[in-house]
Amino acid sequence: MRSFLKPLLTIAAMALGMTAVIPMPAWALVELNVNKGNVEPLPIAITDFQGGDALGAQISQIVTADLKRSGLFAPIDKSAFIEKISNPDAAPRFDDWKVINAQALVTGSVSKEADGRIRAQYRLWDTFAGQQMSGEQFFANDANQRRVAHIIADAIYERLTGEKGYFDTRVVFIDESGAKNARKKRLAIMDQDGANVRYLSDGRSIVLTPRFSPNRQEITYMSYESGQPRVYLLQIETGQRELVGNFPGMTFAPRFSPDGQKVIMSLLRDDGNSNIFAMDLRSRSTTRLTNSTAIDTSPSYSPDGSKVVFTSDRGGRAQIYVMGADGSGQTRISFGDGVYSTPVWSPRGDLIAFTKQTGGEFQIGVMKTDGSGERILSSGFQQEGPTWAPNGRVLMFFRDSNGGPKLVSVDLTGRNEQPIPTANFASDPAWSPLLE
């Protein structure tokens, strides 16, 4: 078979390459249709990657954990494996894998290059068709070992579902530590699985609602360091920050526009009314988008930037509204019982996630962009703040049920809810786009 090479991405100025070894035959059997509702998880066997001592097993463990956490895959316990893979480049004994109902098989290897880089490669096999589906290799420095595993998991996810994965991403959030009445809150960033936590602020001031820019290099957030809530821009890698305007009153809930050129937020005036404004980050000019005597807040752009979803209590209690990006055509779309908050548009453009408080419960749900088809994915005590994975298939939010908030993810079926491990309490998550 002919193979080809093309660039995949750059990590810390280290170019990684992707080599597709053998294309999937058109008649291969393994596939997951993630658009048909509830999907039975696909049984998949993921062997330890050969070589690299403990690193091969670690990469296998990370790939396994990523795929399992998605809810679409059911990794088979290694104790059930019949064949012990010794040469990951050779075709496996497919019958041995069919016996344990492994519909897909992942083999791989890790080695150290002469220049000190890690070389990791994998092969994905369709055991019932008896064919290789894909195979790729990656090079990285030691600092990016975990990223290589996430990239491999993304490649497998995409090959078997036809959609982009979301494992090579980061989450920015509020790390909370200390006693409840003296809680220290710090900006923090981590991999989507809870690893590689790094703190972006020192905890001397209260910080809230961090949000990623589309280029993944900046975040907006709120800080009370001046005594009043103000919106800041922070460069993640350099730590450089700047104040986004010095508005009278208080500013809340900042988010970037999809092109990264604007920040949309709500401003609370002395009269107690909160309205929505957009600021052009180049000219620093602001445009008022709502002008009501109510509380309008929590704005979020649609993926194409043409519309904005927000909440308003102009009808008596907080409901979800949609308007044009210029403030035109403000239309209520939610009509259910309860109080709605924190709406956020899916990266796919098809759904809006929200928090809903009703009957003493806090619910995380989704609805279509016209308000129809409302579905509740999770219910509990004091949970809120959904954020979308970049492929629009999973949500993350925070739940306060044992003395402090923790992060939780849930897929669109509502059946696959997963805790996200953090060393301390954690709130206000925001999911990054896929890294590059």
Curated annotation (Swiss-Prot):
One of its GO terms (biological process) is protein import. Keywords: Cell cycle, Cell division, Periplasm, Signal. Its main location: periplasm. InterPro entries: 6-blade_b-propeller_TolB-like, PD40, Tol-Pal_TolB, TolB_N. GO terms for cellular component: periplasmic space. It is found in: Periplasm. It comes from the Bacteria. Residues 1-28 form the signal peptide. SUPFAM superfamilies: TolB, N-terminal domain, Tricorn protease N-terminal domain. Belongs to the TolB family. Part of the Tol-Pal system, which plays a role in outer membrane invagination during cell division and is important for maintaining outer membrane integrity. The Tol-Pal system is composed of five core proteins: the inner membrane proteins TolA, TolQ and TolR, the periplasmic protein TolB and the outer membrane protein Pal. They form a network linking the inner and outer membranes and the peptidoglycan layer. PANTHER family: PROTEIN TOLB, PROTEIN TOLB HOMOLOG. This is Tol-Pal system protein TolB. It comes from Mesorhizobium japonicum (strain LMG 29417 / CECT 9101 / MAFF 303099) (Mesorhizobium loti (strain MAFF 303099)). The lineage of its organism: Bacteria, Pseudomonadati, Pseudomonadota, Alphaproteobacteria, Hyphomicrobiales.
